[in-house]
Amino acid sequence: MAEQEQGTGIRVEALAPEFQAQAQAWAQRLGLPMTDDEAGFAVQVGVDGLQVQQLGPQAPGPVRVDFVEGQAAHRRLYGGGSGQMIAKAVGIAQGVRPQVLDATAGLGKDAFVLASLGCQMTLIERQPLIAALLEDGLARARGDLEVGGIVERMRLLTGNAIERMRAWEGEAPQVIYLDPMFPHRDKSALVKKEMRVFRPLVGDDLDAPALLEAALALASHRVVVKRPRKAPIIEGVKPSHSLEGKSSRYDIYPKKALKG
């Protein structure tokens, strides 16, 4: 696929001189160079915060985490509230707002939806660059009057989700939500800008069975796995049932009933 032929080297750059110090700090923290003429991606620091820009003539626009405006705001205001499928999948009901661990946080979109509906969220992201975007987006959102209270319900952890779940200390999450990167083979899956940018960097979650196993061992009430609608279930324990939408479905693995 042409979209993946670009090099996967990454450099950090400031979009204006006043962001140079921040860019250098991120470069040091992420272990990335400030100059790399062969890089296929740039981590850019500017007025809109941190963003990742794929380089090259046909590259899509930059990817950043923005919980205040754009898609996240539209979904928060008009997405269907507690009636939307993800809410039903994790067990949101009258008087029930479960504690949820999103073990494959990505850019935090699903976690933000659940937090906006009142769930206490813990997020794990294993890819340091995506985790950095998420951290930056959460930090900017905390200063916003409308969404500041929502993101206060979102706690970000970094590292390997399987290892973190196996070594979990303290109260277990009631619900664990998984959305592993599925190995797509058709170009339609790469239409979304985020997919085009991150698939070469992140790859597919080939350890999905181990991820599910660790989640089932830790969750106190249920595990929910989001999959493309026609994708096979993850190898291992079979889900009890699924909720199916137009393009995706939620496989549900219950352990015990959620109560208010």
From Swiss-Prot:
PANTHER family: RIBOSOMAL RNA SMALL SUBUNIT METHYLTRANSFERASE J. Gene3D superfamilies: Vaccinia Virus protein VP39 (3.40.50.150). The keyword rRNA-binding does not apply. Specifically methylates the guanosine in position 1516 of 16S rRNA. It comes from the Bacteria. InterPro entries: 16SrRNA_methylTrfase_J (IPR007536), SAM-dependent_MTases_sf (IPR029063). The keyword rRNA processing applies. Belongs to the methyltransferase superfamily. RsmJ family. This is Ribosomal RNA small subunit methyltransferase J. It holds the Pfam family SAM_MT. It comes from Pseudomonas entomophila (strain L48). S-adenosyl-L-methionine binds at residues 125-126, 179. HAMAP family: 16SrRNA_methyltr_J. SUPFAM superfamilies: S-adenosyl-L-methionine-dependent methyltransferases. It is found in: Cytoplasm. One of its GO terms (cellular component) is cytoplasm. Its EC number is 2.1.1.242. Keywords: Cytoplasm, Methyltransferase, rRNA processing, S-adenosyl-L-methionine, Transferase. The gene is rsmJ. One of its GO terms (molecular function) is rRNA (guanine-N2-)-methyltransferase activity.
